[in-house]
Amino acid sequence: MNSLVGDVPQSLSSLDDTTTCYNLDASCNKSLVEERPSKILKTTHISPNLHPFSSSNPPPPKHQPSSRILSFEKTGLHVMNHNSPNLIFSPKDEEIGLPEHKKAELIIRGTKRAQSLTRSQSNAQDHILAERKRREKLTQRFVALSALIPGLKKMDKASVLGDAIKHIKYLQESVKEYEEQKKEKTMESVVLVKKSSLVLDENHQPSSSSSSDGNRNSSSSNLPEIEVRVSGKDVLIKILCEKQKGNVIKIMGEIEKLGLSITNSNVLPFGPTFDISIIAQKNNNFDMKIEDVVKNLSFGLSKLT
């Protein structure tokens, strides 16, 4: 019995040793799992004496990972350790680390940004001043326009523009009517002047007399009666002459000599005479007065008798 009791502590001690060894193996395996590197490099040589870890073979020493900072610059790749005592950065240190031309570029960029901001502010103020001046001019012109419109009741811009348009249209119509009346008056005065005919005396000196005058002397009995009317470039010539062969052609020739182009002609026999109506146009070189046309036609046609 005593032997059995003596054997129990030994068995318990051996069990403790086994448990301790088992715990040691578990902790070793756990440390191996935790401390295994993130990437295993391939090797070309395999050692034949590679055995699994056991209690007799101690585990390899723990490898403490060290964090590093990669600094990318043009000079190359630099690796910095966090454990370094001088690992303190500031913007000034970064600027000091830049080359001189980089610093100059940064300074130029900052200057350009400041200048562009100043220019944009000055441009905005100039635009505001220009817009203010433009509105002042526009207001002044509206005031001046409203002073020219008679009977203006409202002073707002829409009313001023509407009444101005109406007044301008009224003035245009008045000008057209005035021009038409002026043309009619000019035509009447031309007709009165052209109704006078020229009579040549015995000395071939022209003397004016009315075409409606029935008292004719013997020297004017054979002369044709001439009436001329002018409207712009159009000339209407009416001639009453004796009925003779060739007179019509000769009369047209005399008219063309004066710088007139005949566009239409009409000849009607009236008793012993011809009533000739001719419409002609002034040429570019025509610069004669109405009286001169009558005189030259009378003098040229007097040779026909």
From Swiss-Prot:
Coiled coil: none annotated. The keyword Cell inner membrane does not apply. GO terms for biological process: regulation of DNA-templated transcription. Expressed in roots. Residues 44-56 have a biased composition (Polar residues). Signal peptide: none annotated. Keywords: DNA-binding, Nucleus, Transcription, Transcription regulation. One of its GO terms (cellular component) is nucleus. Residues 122-171 form the bHLH domain. Residues 41-67, 201-224 are annotated as: Disordered. Pfam families: bHLH-TF_ACT-like_plant (PF22754), HLH (PF00010). Residues 207-222 have a biased composition (Low complexity). GO terms for molecular function: DNA binding; DNA-binding transcription factor activity; protein dimerization activity. Induction: By cold treatment. It is found in: Nucleus. PANTHER family: BHLH TRANSCRIPTION FACTOR, TRANSCRIPTION FACTOR BHLH18. Homodimer. This is Transcription factor bHLH18. The lineage of its organism: Eukaryota, Viridiplantae, Streptophyta, Embryophyta, Tracheophyta.
